[in-house]
Amino acid sequence: MALHTVLVINSGSSSIKYQLVDPASGQALASGLVERIGEEMGAITHKHDEAKTVIEAPVPDHRAGLAKVLELFESEGPSLAEANIAAVGHRVVQGGRYFDGPALVNEAVENRVEALIPLGPLHNGPALAGIRVARQLLPDVPHVVVFDTAFFQGLPEASARYALNREVADKYEIRRYGAHGTSHQYVSSTVSQLLGRDDLKQIVLHLGNGASASAVVNGRAVDTSMGLTPLEGLVMGTRTGDIDPAAVFHLARVAGMDAQELDHLFNRESGMKGLCGDNDMREVWKRIDAGDTQAREAMDIYIHRLLKYVGSYTAVMGGLDALTFTAGIGENDAAIRAELCARLGWLGVELDEQANNQRSPEPRVVSTPDSKVKVLVVPTNEELAIARQAMTLV
């Protein structure tokens, strides 16, 4: 058993993801997922060593869900009493302008996370619920919050400030906050270590069901695609990404949609799902291979948006040394990497086809030795990053 471990918790509106991490070795000692919180019957999956336990039970709220998780640690292992937990790390999406790093949880921090719910309505409320029940159930362990927005706190004003009326923007705290910052920081740092250089101009593409891009110069973020909320930027699984804000006014006027309906449309029924009915890229590729023109068009739109961001960020940074793919799609979809890189020859990008098609859990370079821009695939590990940040405060 590790000398010190961190229990990392990511609370969603109807789920709790968790992982027991040894920050020193990077090893995940156990992990699991509580699903369908608040429904008639919930499900809990717990993995430890090679064993996987799945149970179904009523999970009326987050407290009941986390209590079930703690029971599973004791019955299935590893015992938390023997794991020497140094901290509980909580992922919180929106830290506003108040948090540029991890923070020890106290009443004031809880209150600030709650006050930021209007800026992160889909994420901060569930995260706060998880924090509160975890502090009740594990009262003798320090709790640390790690914010998705923290890595982007230092964005230049030219990137962070919208061209919205200054008084209105400041009053309602409307600016670019970004998201996935923990992943972007972890991945860009890993690239620097892998290439043995800190003086890099990097673009990181975090491509999962949620997707974001970042421009990183010498380890500091200078731009990112997600904005006030995670809705802005790239085409995503179910989110629009960039869209003319007037579409909101138009739909309100002609379709009679209210704010809740528009929020649902833009966040849950758009993106790849809205374009072709599928937000699973594996299914999209199957349909493309079968000659489905709607799926092909959706993929073209997806790649086009990526291309725009790579080009604009290269201009913002005045060059590009490394282009990195991460997260579920970025790490596993060789075809998307190939299609994007095929259109970046003007940057001197040369993809090594064999390296690109090879699956590996390790960080790796997938460009040719002659490529002027290093292209990499780096598996993200947000849980490890959260655990290591938590350990800096305990």
Predicted regions and their residues:
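Short glycine-rich, Thr/Ser-proximal phosphate-binding strand/loop in the N-terminal lobe
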Residues: 6, 15-59, 227
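Glycine-rich beta-strand-to-loop/alpha-helix junction loops that act as flexible
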Residues: 12, 90-95, 207-209, 320-332
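Phosphate/pyrophosphate-binding loops at sites that engage ATP/ADP/AMP, CoA/4′-phosphopantetheine
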Residues: 71-86, 191-196, 310-321
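Short beta-strand-loop/turn "lid" adjacent to the catalytic site in phosphate-handling enzymes
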Residues: 73-123, 144, 150-159
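Glycine-rich phosphate-binding loop of actin/hexokinase-like ATP-binding domains
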Residues: 151-254
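Catalytic phosphate/nucleotide-handling subdomain of diverse soluble enzymes
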Residues: 217, 223-255, 264, 327-358
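A mobile "lid/hinge" subdomain adjacent to the ATP/sugar-phosphate binding pocket shared
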Residues: 255-298
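Internal helix-turn-beta structural module
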Residues: 296, 300-316, 330-394
